[in-house]
Amino acid sequence: MRDGPPDTMRDGPPVTLYCFAHAGAGASGFAHWHTQTGPGVHTVPVLLPGRGARRREPRATSREALLEALLKPLAGQVADGRPYVLYGHSLGGVVAHTLARALINRGLPAPACLAVGASPPPQTAPAGHDTDLSDERLLRFAAALGAAPGGALAAPGSLWYRRVLPLLRDDLTLADALRADALADTSGPLPVPVLAVGGQDDPVVGATVLDGWARWTTGRFIRRTVPGDHFFVRGPHAPRLIGRACRVVRRTRLAPAPLSGGKL
């Protein structure tokens, strides 16, 4: 999971920022983050099975399969107690939440912060999200969000249609499974602060939806809005914001203070 040398700061180790992508995607959406999160942050995009370098592995469509693929390597990296933050975009938000809960339930160090972007909380299914959609309607849904290329590039028979559309459908199935499992879990809210980020032009996940994440933490809840649509993760504003959040929680770790002690 680690990629490249970590950033350093004078006072202690950097914060490791584990990033989880939206449905139908690999890790490329975070390729630019390491140059934009700022000092003291080591960015680590995490690749789910069934895509990129893990394309030959079965795609995860259940909580059990997700944890089988990701929990052991992640647990090995956070066990040393160094500060880390989880950020998930869209589907990645419920993936990050699921992993945070699993790590805590196993007695491992909790993330210093759970950050989610363009991600409805478990109690809210995204508008238009339906795993039973026909290929044609699922393609229209993806195109409306900006997740599919236009014209012939996404037409039936195209490479995108044959490879990405099935991945997108399985990822939506995974999202449904993770939401259902979170609602059935009796462990209670996470004992970590939650930062929910929305795009000001996101047609699907607005401020009211993001506010629903407040019930999933016993700590501080903060919501912020950045320029962009549902895929603001591709721009510069999200990594800068999440980078600042990492530095705030790092200072909190060194000298206890509320998350609001730094400007986000």
Residue locations for each model-derived region?
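Non-catalytic, mobile gating and regulatory segments of ester bond hydrolases
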Residues: 1-264
